């Protein structure tokens, strides 16, 4: 939800390219990366991973459904991507989540399930 967070006055920090690079390294081997965003233009200009597929033109519900069907999930600090990962029924999924969810130093230990990577 990058587009939403550009106007949030720091309530939710925007994840860095380095966060996504580290997350892809944790996932390891993959056939392709599906990119879901409300700021696809920025993603196309700034994310440089092999085999990217930019998902465009869907409703939010369609995106949520597609995200929940992915083999793994790299999520932002958003409830939208959190729910997509939570609803993913792949028993062997790897979920990578940002450690910092809010601009203020708040306790977020109860947000991320223990089996998810928190970087």
Description of each model-found segment:
Residues 1-60, 91:
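Core catalytic architecture of nucleotide-activated donor-dependent transferases building glycoconjugates
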Residues 8, 13, 23, 37, ...:
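Generic serine detector
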Residues 60-107:
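A donor-sugar binding/catalytic signature common to diverse glycosyltransferases
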Residues 103-119:
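Leloir-type glycosyltransferase catalytic cores
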